[in-house]
């Protein structure tokens, strides 16, 4: 391709190697930012008119032309040309065809693709964050609804994947919901740092025509202006921060997916996935595979890889803009889509999930109440370290007799400590056990209801 067809072609006399042209272009993935690019150009055109760089008539033509370009993108009528290196060159080329290059050529006055591209990215990401935030709220609402409807189901709580203590199923769900609620809070913080204006920074040294950056800030809805022009064009912290956030939320999604995969197995059978989020086997007719959950777990690694790959790309580049920064877009776009899809899939899984209370109840075992047995003596003044040992001795006694601790007699317990009395049998009640965990954050019904209200209030 002749260099004269390119925005930067005046310096060059030779044609670019075709492979280099393909290697250099980004239009096939950054074209999704067409709206952001047009919004940025419209605002910049207005700033140029304010400074007398273009006339009011030229501004009107630019604004109308840019809207015509936008309409072509929206209606899939925009035709890409070989010279369209990226979304910025494509839009400027098409604008020139519509209103003439004499006017369109003034649009880039004082503007560099360096400040243009990062403005587009911030505008695009800002819109994505709004969509993701709404999806997170929807997911949390499903968590709350399920926690309310399943409040009376008591299940084994696990540590080290070993049965530990009885808890409410709702308490388990809300443990994951609070992680997602923290993700929502972090997302709001990220938004404020994304929502800062780089436009008007030029290539690196600033704008030579004194465009009003405060006007650009208000026109494009940014919260503030990036005060250093070099930082404005070089900064990709907001990309990395979003990808870190995406990795964090995918970690939380993956951990819940793993729990539900385990609980959906025939060995547990605590839950049954809806057919809408399951698949079968090509050879084994009886299979119902939790592919939705496995993909949620698997795609977390994809998002982690996007973050690490881009961090490696930027860790050693010198100041301001370098072409390495073009590698920010594909991982950003992919992480955003993957996270949004994952949130929506998890929302569907949870809203259609069938809980099997009878199977859950069958999994409750008396040994899970060994701590309660120790606490029985604590309430009578015996030090916990001593009661822990005594309760452990009761567990061992039951194992040696090939029975469970709730089958031991009062005399058996008295042989371990004289303060055990007839009411020790009351220890072996799962409902009573969970209701004792009544400090803030516990699994008692009152505490779980308080947790539900906390999340509801946070979503107001």
Curated annotation (Swiss-Prot):
The record marks 294 as: Increases basicity of active site His. GO terms for molecular function: argininosuccinate lyase activity. The active site is at residues 160, 281. Signal peptide: none annotated. CDD domains: Argininosuccinate_lyase. NCBIfam families: argH. Gene3D superfamilies: Fumarase/aspartase (C-terminal domain), Fumarase/aspartase (Central domain), Fumarase/aspartase (N-terminal domain). This is Probable argininosuccinate lyase. It is an enzyme of class 4 (lyase). GO terms for biological process: arginine biosynthetic process via ornithine; L-arginine biosynthetic process; urea cycle. The keyword Lyase applies. The lineage of its organism: Eukaryota, Fungi, Dikarya, Ascomycota, Taphrinomycotina. Homotetramer. Belongs to the lyase 1 family. Argininosuccinate lyase subfamily. InterPro entries: Arg_succ_lyase_C, Argininosuccinate_lyase, Fumarase/histidase_N, Fumarate_lyase_CS, Fumarate_lyase_fam, Fumarate_lyase_N, L-Aspartase-like. It holds the Pfam family Lyase_1. PANTHER family: ARGININOSUCCINATE LYASE. It comes from the Eukaryota. The keyword Amino-acid biosynthesis applies. 2-(N(omega)-L-arginino)succinate binds at residues 26, 114, 159, 289, 321, 326, 329. Its EC number is 4.3.2.1. Pathway: Amino-acid biosynthesis; L-arginine biosynthesis; L-arginine from L-ornithine and carbamoyl phosphate: step 3/3. It catalyses: 2-(N(omega)-L-arginino)succinate = fumarate + L-arginine. Keywords: Amino-acid biosynthesis, Arginine biosynthesis, Lyase. GO terms for cellular component: cytosol. It comes from Schizosaccharomyces pombe (strain 972 / ATCC 24843).
């Amino acid at each position: 391709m002749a260099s004269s067809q390119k925005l930067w072609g005046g310096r060059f006399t030779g044609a670019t190697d075709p492979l280099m042209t393909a290697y250099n272009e980004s239009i096939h993935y950054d074209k999704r930012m067409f709206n952001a690019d047009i919004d940025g150009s419209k605002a910049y055109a207005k700033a140029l008119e304010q400074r007398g760089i273009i006339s009011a008539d030229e501004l009107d033509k630019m604004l109308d032309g840019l809207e015509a370009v936008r309409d072509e993108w929206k209606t899939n009528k925009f035709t890409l040309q070989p010279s369209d290196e990226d979304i910025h060159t494509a839009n400027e080329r098409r604008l020139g065809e519509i209103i003439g290059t004499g006017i369109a050529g003034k649009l880039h006055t004082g503007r560099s693709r360096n400040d243009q591209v990062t403005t587009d990215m911030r505008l695009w990401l800002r819109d994505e964050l709004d969509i993701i935030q709404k999806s997170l709220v929807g997911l949390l609402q499903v968590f709350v609804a399920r926690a309310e409807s399943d409040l009376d189901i008591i299940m084994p709580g696990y540590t080290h994947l070993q049965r530990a203590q009885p808890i409410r199923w709702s308490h388990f769900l809300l443990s994951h919901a609070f992680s997602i609620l923290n993700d929502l809070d972090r997302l709001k913080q990220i938004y404020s740092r994304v929502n800062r204006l780089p436009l008007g920074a030029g290539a690196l040294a600033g704008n030579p025509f004194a465009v009003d950056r405060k006007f650009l800030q208000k026109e494009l809805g940014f919260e503030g202006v990036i005060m250093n022009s070099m930082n404005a064009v070089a900064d990709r912290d907001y990309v990395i921060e979003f990808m870190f956030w995406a990795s964090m939320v995918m970690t939380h999604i993956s951990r819940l997916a793993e729990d539900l995969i385990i609980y959906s197995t025939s060995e547990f059978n605590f839950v049954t996935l809806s057919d809408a989020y399951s698949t079968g086997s090509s050879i084994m007719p009886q299979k119902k595979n939790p592919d939705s959950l496995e993909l949620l777990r698997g795609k977390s690694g994809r998002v982690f890889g996007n973050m690490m790959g881009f961090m490696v790309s930027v860790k050693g580049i010198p100041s301001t803009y370098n072409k390495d920064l073009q590698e920010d877009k594909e991982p950003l776009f992919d992480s955003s889509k993957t996270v949004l899809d994952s949130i929506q899939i998890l929302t569907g899984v949870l809203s259609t999930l069938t809980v099997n209370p009878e199977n859950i109840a069958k999994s409750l075992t008396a040994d899970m109440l060994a701590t309660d047995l120790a606490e029985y003596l604590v309430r009578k003044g015996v030090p916990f370290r001593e009661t822990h040992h005594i309760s452990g001795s009761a567990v061992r006694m039951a194992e040696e007799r090939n029975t469970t601790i709730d089958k031991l007699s009062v005399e058996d317990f008295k042989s371990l400590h004289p303060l055990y009395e007839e009411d020790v049998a009351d220890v072996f009640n799962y409902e009573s056990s969970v209701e004792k965990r009544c400090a803030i954050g516990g699994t008692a019904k009152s505490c779980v209801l308080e947790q539900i209200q906390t999340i509801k209030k946070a979503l107001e």
